[in-house]
From Swiss-Prot:
Its cofactor is Mg(2+). The gene is panB. Pathway: Cofactor biosynthesis; (R)-pantothenate biosynthesis; (R)-pantoate from 3-methyl-2-oxobutanoate: step 1/2. Gene3D superfamilies: Phosphoenolpyruvate-binding domains. It comes from Methylococcus capsulatus (strain ATCC 33009 / NCIMB 11132 / Bath). This is 3-methyl-2-oxobutanoate hydroxymethyltransferase. Homodecamer; pentamer of dimers. Catalyzes the reversible reaction in which hydroxymethyl group from 5,10-methylenetetrahydrofolate is transferred onto alpha-ketoisovalerate to form ketopantoate. It is an enzyme of class 2 (transferase). 3-methyl-2-oxobutanoate binds at D46, S47, D85, K114. Belongs to the PanB family. One of its GO terms (molecular function) is 3-methyl-2-oxobutanoate hydroxymethyltransferase activity.
Length: 269
């Protein structure tokens, strides 16, 4: 069996220019399929609020929910690195964040925890890093901020917000973050951030120039009633789910996905 994927492996992949394939999973059977297909990172996302619980946002997801689903995924992930979201209001202070992370790691089996936010989260990222908790940042569209944002929309299109996001990325990396998710931002901005930091970037709706890509499992299989523009139905044209996951891995690795039709430009629609 191939050795388990580690954070140093992902850093080495960035240096080599090798793309990282990531998908969300919330249960053991999905995680097993992804693991067998060569997915390097499985994200147990708070998106389970949308696609598993049927909620309109991720805000109702609790730490107990995240621990349960992370444990389900971890049992089946023999090779892939397991990354788990810290849910809404579970990391308001460094002390609360480390307690929440302890549950995801001890009880859920996560290897990395993800949190949303930029410079306002630096104290939390530093404290977690000091306690040897690996952290993944999340910039761009932040679903946990939906009530402040008003709607799910492209972020970082204007010069001021783009410059702020680049600086946020640098500061998160300096504070100790080891991965960075970039969601729904112009591909030009994602390319700039990816070049500005030494840690791997994983994009969703952020173009092909990120170090890796992630999609929500249900979106990748075309199960959602309305697919976001940045998604592709990989089940269409393939014989089954296993083949669809393999196709996703191949296209990410080859730099085929995401294509222009799945990306946003600064001056585009």
């Amino acid at each position: 069996m191939t050795d388990p994927v580690t954070l140093p492996d992902l850093l080495a992949m960035k240096r080599r220019g090798e793309k990282i394939a990531c998908l969300t999973a919330y249960d053991a059977s999905s995680a097993a399929l992804q693991d067998e297909a060569g997915i390097e990172v499985i994200l147990v996302g708070d998106s389970l609020g949308n696609v598993i619980q049927g909620q309109p946002t991720t805000l109702s997801v609790t730490l107990d929910h995240m621990v349960y689903h992370t444990a389900c995924v971890q049992r089946a992930a023999r090779r892939a690195l397991v990354l788990a979201d810290l849910p809404f209001l579970s990391y308001c202070t460094p002390e609360q964040a480390v307690r929440s992370a302890a549950r995801l790691i001890r009880d859920g089996g996560a290897q990395v925890v993800k949190l949303e936010g930029g410079r306002e989260r630096l104290d939390v990222v530093r404290f977690l890093t000091e306690q040897n908790v690996p952290v993944c940042g999340h910039l761009g569209l932040q679903p946990q901020a939906i009530h402040r944002l008003g709607r799910y929309a492209l972020q970082g299109r204007d010069a001021e917000s783009a410059c702020r996001m680049v600086e946020d990325a640098r500061q998160l990396a300096e504070a100790g973050a080891m991965l960075l998710v970039l969601e729904c931002i112009p591909w030009e901005l994602a390319q700039e951030i990816t070049a500005a930091v030494d840690i791997p970037t994983i994009g969703i709706g952020a173009g092909r120039h990120c170090d890796g890509q992630v999609l929500v499992w249900q979106d990748m299989l075309g199960m959602s009633a309305r697919l976001p523009r940045f998604c592709k139905d990989f089940l269409a044209g393939n014989a089954g789910v296993r083949e669809a996951v393999s196709a996703y891995v191949r296209e990410v690795k080859a730099g085929i996905f995401p294509g222009d039709r799945h990306s946003f430009g600064r001056d585009g629609p």
